Amino acid sequence: MKNVTITLLFIIQTFSVRSQTVPGSIMPLNSNEFRNRIAIRELIDSFAYYADRTKAQRQAALFVENGTLEIYQSEPDTSKPIIVLKGRKELEEAFKGLEKYNMTFHLNGQNSIKFGDDTTGTVQCLAHHIFFENGKRMLQTEAIRYYDTYTRQNNRWLFVKRKLIIDWEDKRLSTP
């Protein structure tokens, strides 16, 4: 019983919003910021989930009406995007392109969110795509970083802009 009590106290202390801090930050989170961070993380994870379930319309609806997705093969500060999509209709059509894969799996990793005049974030993702090429099952893996700008509309967080940077990619034969 003593171990259960100690464990519960540890969990309560760890997740107490009054004392919670952001890694690399000395500023404690207040409960409103804590809720907003969770809501933004749900937005980020919903984007990956809808990509994997090929729900292009729902994925596009995670953006503001005139939201933008820019795709880069190197740092945005030193290069131009290879693709720019603007507005939910363009985004939805582009997201339908994931239907060409037999399966996808996007695994979101670290993320950092900064609140201010603009709410921004950085997200890391490993994207896995299974497809067939010349009768052979292939796996394409991409290490992706997103530089995001978020806004809150009608009590819901949405993407204003996502800059998708492909850090590296690997394509190989896949054996189930």
Name each region found by the language model:
Residues 56-126:
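A solvent-exposed, acidic/Ser-Thr-rich amphipathic alpha-helical stretch
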Residues 20-53, 57, 61-65:
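Short, low-complexity N-terminal intrinsically disordered segments enriched in polar/charged residues
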Residues 33-36, 80, 84, 139:
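Alpha-helix initiation/capping motif
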Residues 46, 90-93, 145:
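Alpha-helical elements of Rossmann-like donor-binding domains used by nucleotide-donor carbohydrate transfer enzymes
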Residues 1-23:
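Bacterial Sec-dependent N-terminal signal peptides
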Residues 20-32, 97-176:
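A beta-strand edge to alpha-helix "cap/lid" segment located at domain peripheries
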